């Protein structure tokens, strides 16, 4: 491996996200990572054609795969076939593989919003005024609907969607990790403005909760975001485990936290490249 490994950094700089600036975050990260790596940025639709020229591919704020599902599948297949190093590694069990893991975690009795994907399993869900219906391959709330129990009886998309009870949670909170090392946490105090985040100081129980899902995912390297909600009884429930291209909201943390994250990421990439 050369002293300065080359990275193909995959990002959609122009992707419009409510309350978030994907491009600004990736401009910042690449400006800092250039201290250690030779970098080139590319759009996700160009990654498959370019990836063989670099020591590794770093997938960052590339937007929801739902928008370019076929091209992502071709990129993934080519990377696996050619042994291309992709960061995060393509073995993630969370959102990278679709949201079916929420069914597995529900079945295993883990602290997750109860999730089903078959009409005959609806009675396994807690009673609720409304139920969230989301695509198995969704992201950024794309395709999210809220239906009554009666409306679920007429749902014709079974097999393509997941159903969860709508929970009157206190707030949402996200925990950010590089490899298995916790970096920082952010929360949305107002459930009606979930994109407005503030720094959050987790306690030991919060960290144990978040770390349990990072451990479950078994990724040796990579960036992961554990999204959870604080239930009315005070417990945390997993909303999603984002292990493909989690937005990091680095502009909302203190400078020393942000710099610590950059150094942790650079160290992780060096170890990943061997």
Task: Give short role names for the model-derived ranges.
Residues 35, 108-111, 216-222:
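Short secondary-structure junctions
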Residues 54-59, 134, 175-177, 184, ...:
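A short beta-strand motif that forms the metal-chelation/ATP-contact edge
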Residues 46-53, 77, 122-127, 152-155:
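Short amphipathic alpha-helix with an adjacent loop that forms part of the alpha/beta core around
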Residues 230-274:
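C-terminal active-site "lid" helix and adjoining low-complexity regulatory extension at the edge
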Residues 1-85:
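ATP-binding N-terminal substructure of ATP-dependent carboxylate-amine bond-forming enzymes
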Residues 73-148:
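A conserved helix-loop-beta module that forms one wall/lid of the active-site cleft
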